Amino acid sequence: VGVSRTFCYFYDMHNFYAKAIRDFANDQRPLGGFTETAPYNGIADQGLGDGSGPIGWQLAFAFLQKQLYEYYGDKRIIENYYPQLKKQVNFLASKAEDYMIDRCINDHESLDQRIPALFATAHFYHHVLLITEFAQLTNRKADQQQYESLAQKIKAAFIQKFVQTGTGKIGNGTPAEQAFGLYYGLIPEEIKTKVIQQLVQAISDRNNHITSGIF
């Protein structure tokens, strides 16, 4: 999943990833969460209960649908699996406190000190952005409005908790934390330059070595 963009760019991976999506859907947990692996083998590291996997790995279900739409124009797969995605996002929302989720594998195997809630909430936000987009694509206007509102609340909570708007530092200011804030758009636009400067400085402080995790 992590290299799906690369594979989709070089190869015809539609059927391969469509099967992966189907496997996740088949193993969706009763409360709505998705498993860490599909087919499910019982692993649920830092999951959110009911046999669900960590929130970053649960993102695979929506993320792969996005890839198939972008690379192959497959809107049908988004329509077909929308009910399962909605059930999952509502499950994630039920696990949030003040619009934040505090558990995940986070910056896995990073050499830096990590804040699990920062990474988990960023993944939660991305889930909600994707279902908002999918609701728009499939003409579910009420859902689109509902999830747009939820995304705004998650972003506001993230900024209040983790973003130092004066300096542009996110969390502990590690390269991964700065990159997550930038990539997911979880910062006020007016401090983007400061956030980038903090990212560059964080990398420089580590002798230009990569200290982030593997996913």
Please give the residue ranges for each predicted region.
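Active-site core of glycosidic bond-cleaving carbohydrate-active enzymes
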Residues: V1-F215
